[in-house]
Design a protein with these regions (language model features):
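Transmembrane helix-loop-helix hairpins at membrane boundaries of multipass inner-membrane proteins
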Residues: 1-18, 36-114, 121-128
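Alpha-helical transmembrane segments of multi-pass inner-membrane proteins
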Residues: 21, 25, 50, 100, ...
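Short conserved micro-motifs on helix faces and helix-strand junctions that flank
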Residues: 23, 92-93, 106, 142, ...
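Alpha-helical transmembrane segments of multipass membrane proteins
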Residues: 30-35, 60, 110-114, 135-139, ...
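Small-residue faces within membrane-embedded alpha-helices
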Residues: 24, 48, 106-109, 134, ...
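Membrane-embedded alpha-helical segments of multi-pass membrane proteins
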Residues: 24-28, 54, 152-159
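N-terminal signal-anchor/start-transfer transmembrane helix
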Residues: 21-38
């Protein structure tokens, strides 16, 4: 019965750009938390938690559909030409290696958002950065194009720098600069 449910779910999700939705949902949440939570920290937290939960549920559905289908290769593939002259495509998919990382990333962002409920300094910025970080991490794990991978990798570095430099520990300034230097040098 569970196998039939997974197969039905896989068939249902196959025609939907589910992986793009996994990237877009946290991005919309980040924008909503930042702009709608301007004067209300609790609203910003609630928006971030809701959007991270939706991404978690969607990744769980993809996980069930993938492993229930018995497919061992790429699934839910999306490929759109982006810059044809340079051979750059928006090409994303998941496989048995990337899917657990996608699911764990959505789970960790949801839990991090939930357990950082007591953040009181620049709350809307913090919650927005968490969701932008989720966008970048999910893109890194789902990218099949090197240029797209690099873009998502750089997207991860920006919110991480600000999260460390604003909400970090006692040596947050030193740590954030070191993080920025090492990760940017490594990304070249």
């Amino acid at each position: 019965m569970l196998e039939n449910l997974a197969t039905t779910l896989a068939d249902t999700l196959e025609g939907i750009p589910v992986l793009s939705l996994l990237i877009i949902i946290p991005l919309i949440g980040a924008l909503a938390a930042f702009f709608l939570g301007k004067n209300n920290a609790k609203l910003a937290k609630s928006i971030a938690l809701a959007f991270s939960f939706v991404a978690l549920v969607l990744s769980a559905l993809v996980l069930i559909a993938y492993y229930g289908s018995g497919n061992g290769g790429f699934m839910f593939s999306e490929n759109y030409v982006w810059v044809e002259q340079l051979g750059i495509n928006y090409n994303i998919a998941i496989d048995g290696l990337s899917l657990p990382m996608v699911f764990l990333s959505t789970l960790l962002v949801f839990l991090a958002t939930l357990f950082s409920w007591d953040v009181s300094e620049k709350t809307r910025t913090y919650m927005s950065l968490m969701l932008v970080l989720e966008v970048g991490v999910l893109g890194v794990f789902m990218s099949l194009d090197y240029f797209l991978f690099y873009i998502f990798w750089e997207i991860v570095l920006i919110p991480m720098f600000f999260l460390i430099s604003i909400w970090g520990g006692p040596n947050k300034s030193y740590a954030s600069i070191k993080f920025l230097i090492y990760t940017h040098v490594a990304s070249l």
